[in-house]
């Protein structure tokens, strides 16, 4: 499946595997708070995050309404990120794709998750068939757009390289 997404969309398979490993431990951990409650709490408890959280809560309600999902049924992080790819609602609404062709963009089904991550990276500057992952490269910046932390990108890139090295060695 990873190779199918990689071949179809042109995104490095090791990067895809690295991202879902960092974000959700390959789907094992994707949050313990309901996304609705997490965002609502941010609005009222952290004034400096209130405007952002209000926008994300609105995006989440749009997502749930459009897919006939109970807004209290999806668990995520304290910041409202959810699913195997830990998308925030606005990112999910803007970048998630229906890779498996079942007419639904799933946050918890691997074909759609991997396809959506690849789509996010591509829409944020990832260059297919470019093996430059050095700091400041377009591929590095596409991961930085996913999570705006230099440390995060560094860890993702280190894990990507380690996975690649181990697979190539075997």
Q: Where on the chain are the PLM-derived regions?
A:
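Catalytic glycan-binding domains that act on GlcNAc-containing polysaccharides
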Residues: 1-170
